[in-house]
């Protein structure tokens, strides 16, 4: 249920929100997420956002800036850096590849 909540609320979910919603302590929740996903809460949210961004880049004509905002990044340069680090290419390069 926690993982589904993160998937559905990836844009603005915080560890504080999750802890409050599921009546769990933040340390316990952090450990649980790490055990279930293999990554930290922050890394998990980033992975979900990047996956959603990839899908949008392939299936829409939205600008990279709008996609960044849609998946929860206010700064497009930050989004571009994270995307390039994750996929070894910029969002534009990803969109243009065949």
Question: Model segments located where?
Answer:
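General nucleic-acid-binding
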Residues: 1-17
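Basic/polar phosphate-binding segments, predominantly the helix-turn-helix DNA-binding elements
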Residues: 12, 16-48, 68-90
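Terminal helix-turn-helix DNA-binding modules in bacterial transcription factors
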Residues: 3-8, 35-74, 96-98
